Amino acid sequence: MFDPKSLDSGSRSILTMKNRLVSWAWALTLMYMLVSLILPIGALLQKSSQESVSEFVSIATAPVAMSAYAVTLSSALIAALLNGVFGLLIAWVLVRYEFPGRRLLDAAVDLPFALPTSVAGLTLATVYSDQGWIGTWLSSLNIQVAFTRLGVMLAMLFVSFPFVVRTLQPVLQDMERELEEAAWSLGASPFNTFLRVLCPPLMPAMMTGIALAFSRAVGEYGSVVIVSGNIPFQDLIAPVLIFQRLEQYDYSGATVIGTVVLLISLTLLLAINWIQASNRKFLG
């Protein structure tokens, strides 16, 4: 067994210094988490807990709030699933193929990270409005995107897209092509090769990317408020409803609705993390 007394004074000084550095690192980490994450969430929960149970339930289950939850969660889920499919395709192309403009396309994937969400919303509204480049053509087909629920999903697609691609790329880069070639040589079809050889190692990363995309879409405000009509019971989402409550100085309503969205998001993320852990155990 290791005995600190067996060390000379110089070694004990080094060991003591390392322990202090570790302690300081832990203290700084906890302080950062406390200030940036735990305190704001705690303040929100504390503010909403000041309401009585009946008042909390009344505000949280108001028809306009229930509609906003439904629009937010359903639109975010559809956007995340679509990004899961097309994000996988784009990540596959970027990793497995060389073509002119590949680096430019790879850099463009990160554009939603750098672009202000208000600029993204303005761009989408300009392009998909009735007088926009694409909106004009869609209008001839009686399809309206801007200032509708489709606009909400489009904005969520835009801001959450990079999460899936960037989560899948490292996994695809680490996968050996020899596994695919071996499956093909044994007579497996491309579909069976994907389903039995590629899908198992990709599934945890895919679910992580979809979860991150969903979380990002649920919290989106800047682009949605511009590209949607923000009409209750139609395309009003929870973050915009919270802001409307703040504009009306209804702080109780804003905190209660914010708490509900927070709890829903945390519950879904915990469920997804549990599924990921189960998949890892199943895959060994």
UniProtKB/Swiss-Prot annotation:
Family annotation (InterPro entries): CysT_permease, MetI-like, MetI-like_sf, Sulph_transpt2
Single Gene Ontology MF annotation: ABC-type sulfate transporter activity
Highest taxon above the source species: Eukaryota
Subcellular location: Plastid, Chloroplast membrane
Membrane topology: Multi-pass membrane protein
This protein's UniProt keywords: Chloroplast, Membrane, Plastid, Sulfate transport, Transmembrane, Transmembrane helix, Transport
Entry GO terms, CC: chloroplast membrane; plasma membrane
Xref: CDD domains: TM_PBP2
TM region(s), chain numbering: 25-45, 75-95, 107-127, 145-165, 194-214, 223-243, 255-275
UniProt domain ABC transmembrane type-1: residue ranges: 69-272
The UniProt record lists the keyword Nucleotide-binding: no
One Pfam family per UniProt: BPD_transp_1
Cysteines paired by S-S bonds: none
Family statement drawn from the similarity comment of this UniProt entry: Belongs to the binding-protein-dependent transport system permease family. CysTW subfamily.
Function: Part of the ABC transporter complex cysAWTP (TC 3.A.1.6.1) involved in sulfate/thiosulfate import. Probably responsible for the translocation of the substrate across the membrane.
UniProt protein name: Probable sulfate transport system permease protein cysT
Annotated organism of origin: Nephroselmis olivacea (Green alga)
